């Protein structure tokens, strides 16, 4: 499990404020791809184009990288829910996508 410190506090739907995410990549299963794809849809509906968070793997949608990291955060951070993804700052979204690349996909 890796810890990501947020650039700004995040207030969850339950009212709790958090300053870091626990990314539990080891807990991810193939069925979590459905959740990641839902997050990709949410991201796509909220912004034009993709989040460009690196060029390590141009074949993997940058939004999917961010979504996979967020699903890992949901698995590891108590109280974090899928609807909290749109509250994450752009800086944190970019960094989460890079975290996914370096700590999960190319570990």
Labelled PLM ranges:
Residues 1-107:
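Short, surface-exposed, charged amphipathic helix/loop patches that serve as local interaction elements
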């Amino acid at each position: 499990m890796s810890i990501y410190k947020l650039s700004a506090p995040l207030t969850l739907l339950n009212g709790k404020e958090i300053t870091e995410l626990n990314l539990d990549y080891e807990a991810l299963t193939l069925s979590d791809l459905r959740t990641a794809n839902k997050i990709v849809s949410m991201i796509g509906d909220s912004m034009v184009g993709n989040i460009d968070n690196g060029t390590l793997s141009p074949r993997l949608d940058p939004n999917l990288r961010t979504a996979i990291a967020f699903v890992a955060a949901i698995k590891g951070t108590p109280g974090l829910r899928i609807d909290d993804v749109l509250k994450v700052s752009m800086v944190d979204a970019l960094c989460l996508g890079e975290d996914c690349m370096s700590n999960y996909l190319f570990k």
